[in-house]
């Protein structure tokens, strides 16, 4: 199995995301991790991951292949055989943007900021107001759908300073960057002089400094808020592990983010999912299988009693129609099985025989008769050994 991270997880989008959603997520993350802007040790690796994920998910054919077969399907098709340049992807998406002034100007162009400079607060707030939270549910909750009470911490506009960060509203223009929020750096490269803009360390990109800081938020403009929300989760979560709850992310002034709920499904010791079908292995006493009788089987709703016909063999399958999960995914992307209700597939497994008394064993021996399958095996075995001796 591939050790690569899930492409949807990398771009922080759900499996039902539109191309517009995917492109928007890519632009945000590509800017965040671009090595010329982010100096963290792992930024370049994350930048490559983001670009690789976008190259696949932005292409309908590659996306369908990935949705159906995962990374292994892409490997088989030759996608991961080299020649991938993440900067080619980045440049194709951001073609038409002016990079001469550095990344600060790109932010202004992309997000429509009227002012110059990296302190474009609209951009920073837009990418920061979305919130990712993780919850765990069990297999039956996912299969049947459930409503979970989700408790998490988000940030909201500080009520004391109304998001200004100042206790008295008095702010001072930063003298280091003259209110621009950025400092210009020039460096010589093989391609000539390259000019970049980096965040002003004095004002942290705000263009202003605060004399009397708000005591409640310590000039951070936002404070923590613990919230609880009831979230509905359906069986699609098996294949779309991110549930988006609109308007429940961070809140800053008039900007309201979304809650990206990453759902982890705990594995079941009883059930196994195959497409939209649910497989369950049931242990049966061999004598009950031979003579027939009633057995108990687990379904997604309850424990059910069914009649087992005489002569049931080890490995026999009993299919209960519409006993699987009900998926409502785009069949054009996932396939026909992912847009309908599946079946419950019961696999019969012989348990170890019960212990019997000598009298019971003697009585059972009376019913032993030649077994055609055993006889055939013994014939083949003898033939194999006889051929060996004759050589």
UniProtKB/Swiss-Prot annotation:
Species name: Mycoplasmoides gallisepticum (strain R(low / passage 15 / clone 2))
Stretches assigned to the J domain: 6-70
Family the UniProt entry places it in: Belongs to the DnaJ family.
Required cofactor names: Zn(2+)
Subcellular location: Cytoplasm
Binding-site residues for Zn(2+) 1, renumbered to this chain: 158, 161, 214, 217
Comment, domains: The J domain is necessary and sufficient to stimulate DnaK ATPase activity. Zinc center 1 plays an important role in the autonomous, DnaK-independent chaperone activity of DnaJ. Zinc center 2 is essential for interaction with DnaK and for DnaJ activity.
InterPro entries with a match to the protein in the record: DnaJ (IPR012724), DnaJ_C (IPR002939), DnaJ_domain (IPR001623), DnaJ_domain_CS (IPR018253), HSP40/DnaJ_pept-bd (IPR008971), HSP_DnaJ_Cys-rich_dom (IPR001305), HSP_DnaJ_Cys-rich_dom_sf (IPR036410), J_dom_sf (IPR036869)
Gene Ontology molecular function: any one: heat shock protein binding
Record's keyword terms, sorted: Chaperone, Cytoplasm, DNA replication, Metal-binding, Repeat, Stress response, Zinc, Zinc-finger
Zinc finger (CR-type): 145-226
Gene3D superfamilies: DnaJ domain, Heat shock protein DnaJ, cysteine-rich domain, Urease metallochaperone UreE, N-terminal domain
CXXCXGXG motif repeats: 158-165, 174-181, 200-207, 214-221
Record text on cofactor binding: Binds 2 Zn(2+) ions per monomer.
Superkingdom of origin: Bacteria
Protein's recorded name: Chaperone protein DnaJ
